[in-house]
Amino acid sequence: MPVSTFRVARRRFASIGLAVIASTLLLTTSTASAQDVMTKESAAVVKAAFLADLEVMRGKFIGLAQAFPADKYTWRPMDGVRSVSEVLMLIASEGYGFAPTGLGGKAGLTREEMAPLSKVTDKAQVIDHLTKGFAHAKKEIESIDPATLTGKRRVMGQDRALPDIVIAIGGDMHEHLGQLIAYARTNHVVPPWSK
């Protein structure tokens, strides 16, 4: 895809995402807004938008994981900064844990089972965990009744409404996607969607 076409597509996707969020926020503003309660319908829209975003991220993270040569999985830009495999395994862990539990779903692994994941550097194992982590998040989030998402939940030490939660989780994952894109470009790895 030519760069100009990619930019237009990216802007269009961002505009659609912002429109969905704006529409959701407008739908949630009602007489109940003083109580910070969303409607079930609004919660369903936010949940669907988050699932769609997770699917886009899944494709990009797995695409980058496949594009990186195995010998670059331990590469890091400097000491004290996550390596390629550590970023990928963090995202796998978020699929197993933070993404579904932030919305009330169940974790796919216990904390004890997740602890050693940051040490996995084998390309095939990393891709396997990414695939399983995203699949778990999707399955759990799809199973959540939107009616349970209308109020606030305690996430990251704060009471948060659903839009705040999905922005926090999605924002964190997108931040790491950007980090991984920078790692890829630094190592002359072209993101598959940019070819």
Residue locations for each model-derived region?
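Short, contiguous alpha-helical
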Residues: 51-55, 59-62, 72-114, 154-195
